[in-house]
């Protein structure tokens, strides 16, 4: 059982676009209220290979066996800016992606009001944020993960499946709670 908190939404309510495109139907998820204690659907996280602000390549498949905190944000987004110190602290607290948790930011250069890759990298450096932020230059990841608002954070379990998401800013305490919840749910 996922045991979703009030902060972490089930994946079935926001299945990434790659899972529903062309099906003709909206995906549905069983909930406890629908039919007792049924399990939410297992939805593989869309894989990607993108480059971060340091020029390093990141592929989701490279992190198999680790919990992933995937945060979609924008430099112009006030709530995003508000939670970034807590994301940096989470990144440092869990060993800078060397342990069981991988923290990745996702920025979409040129989308809407967003600046260039260089401007995003400068923003990160000037503010002391060292957690890797991959550049979704073709917006494929933003589309595949169904991003409708910033910030949005997806939790991906060690099996590479979507565990849940939060479509708003979080405190550091909530971030740690959803990370622990995702880790505890793994076999």
Q: What name fits each language-model region?
A:
Residues 118-159:
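Short, internal strand/loop/helix patches
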Residues 1-14, 68, 72-73, 79, ...:
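Gram-positive cell-envelope targeting signals
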Residues 98-115, 129-138:
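Thiol-based oxidoreductase modules, predominantly thioredoxin-like and allied folds used
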Residues 18, 155-187:
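Thiol-/selenol-based redox modules, centered on thioredoxin-like
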Residues 1-44, 187:
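N-terminal targeting signals for export/organelle localization
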Residues 40-42, 47-68, 91-95:
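A short beta-strand-turn-helix
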Residues 64, 72-89:
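Conserved redox-active cysteine motifs that mediate thiol-disulfide chemistry
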